[in-house]
Amino acid sequence: MTNLTFYGAVNEIGGNKILLEDNGTKLFLDFGMSFGTANKYFSEFLQPRKCSGLGDFIEFGLLPDLQGVYRSDFIKHMGRPKEDLNIQGLLVSHAHADHASYINHLHEDLPIYCSDETYCILKALNDTSSSGFNDITDLSVCFETHVKDGKVIRTKGEKLDRKYKPFKFKEKFHIDEIEVEPYRVDHSLSGATGYIIHTSSGTIVYTGDFRFHGRREKETATFMEACKEAKPDVLIIEGTRVDSTNSKKELEVEDEICDISSKAKGLSICNWSVRDTDRMLSFLNAAKKLGKKLAISLKQAYLLDELAKCGDSIAPKTGDEDLTLYANRKSWGVIGDSNWCDKIRDEDYDSWERPYLDRAVCYKDIRANQKDYLMFCSNFDLKELIDIKPAEGSVYIKSVCEPFDAEMEMDWGRIMNWINHFGMNVESTHVSGHASGPQLKEFVEQVNAKNIIPLHTENAKAFENWSKNVTLLGKVGESYVL
């Protein structure tokens, strides 16, 4: 018998956590954060307590209270008896937080299966993040003590490598008796994967997040054809944009960026999702066409160098002559000041940032040559504008999704205050990382699964317009038996 239990993404977008059980083998499909549930109780300044281990997360339903799943140091600190690992693997569809950010809570010996690119992205996040994505690819054991001079004192715990098992697309592998076929799909970051999973009771397709309008749309079409040939018993499909008919292409965004920046009389300030290398390529190609340079953050440079190790064919390379690195002012803020030696400058930056500094530009370079640059500027980087002082005719190119909750509305209102303060125009161009309604309809009809379980959507009922075999989940924790 094969059983699926849905611990997240039920009647909401994100938070995928699906437990698959088949003849004694247990696998999780993704282990992400539910933004909706998390934002009900926590914020940037009100975070779950580390001292409670998993307790705060379990209290508010952010994590299921399961045995043999979570890291040993947290379990011990919570006063629970030792729990041996009783789950055989985690399949990660991609590296977005709503699918992967709670990996840091999982058992240190759990095998984690993902694409090479997904591992590289998670490693970059782990290495460069000050919070949130720590303990994703390695784990620092917490709450350790030792005895010195007859006294118990705290000690720094051992650092353990997590048990990642990166795979190649289209190469089948087994977890016990379960056979897994991973396929690349088009999404708004590299390495996104859809799975065809063969169990003792039948075949399951898990789409993860996907689309047909990016630079890898042919890969999604290949996955769809493979799913059709597999004749699945169950299709677990995302439905983020089930109500949308907009299927604008990524290449159209590239053209619009080029048009917007060509009209700018000053600096082109650009905001897109930091890990979306498809969008980064759109900005880079636009810069090339205009004879400009694209300035990206040091975090993005580190990510690109990690992706280069696994042979990502689409992500830009940090050696590209039209790509430059921008170093923010930090701590003492002496970068660009010749009165200070490199050693003092370097102390402002983390060890992973320092190798990039000698080839990075700073605010002085951008300020003096504003027409020559498209510059990445996340919400956290807005402070750089104080020193850059955007010239008259500068433009802010917004290339992210529209605000969809009150907190995002407040954030955008604050950003607009900065934009207005510096007298910049705002232009928008964006396409989603998710399939539109017509694209979802085509996928459902082509695959023709015996049963369909919509997930990662606020309107699962819409799928009933396309199939009579739809199972609607009512609440988190519900199960489905094949």
Describe each region flagged by the PLM.
Residues T2-E12, N16-G89, Y102-D278, S282, ...:
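His/Asp/Glu-rich metal-coordinating catalytic cores
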Residues Y7, D30, S115, Y183, ...:
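Generic beta-strand/beta-sheet core signal
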Residues I13-G15, L473-L482:
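Binuclear metal-dependent phosphoesterase catalytic core
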Residues G89-H99, H187, H456:
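Histidine-centered divalent metal-coordination motifs
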Residues G214-K299, A391-S467:
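Cap/insert and terminal regions of metallo-dependent hydrolase folds
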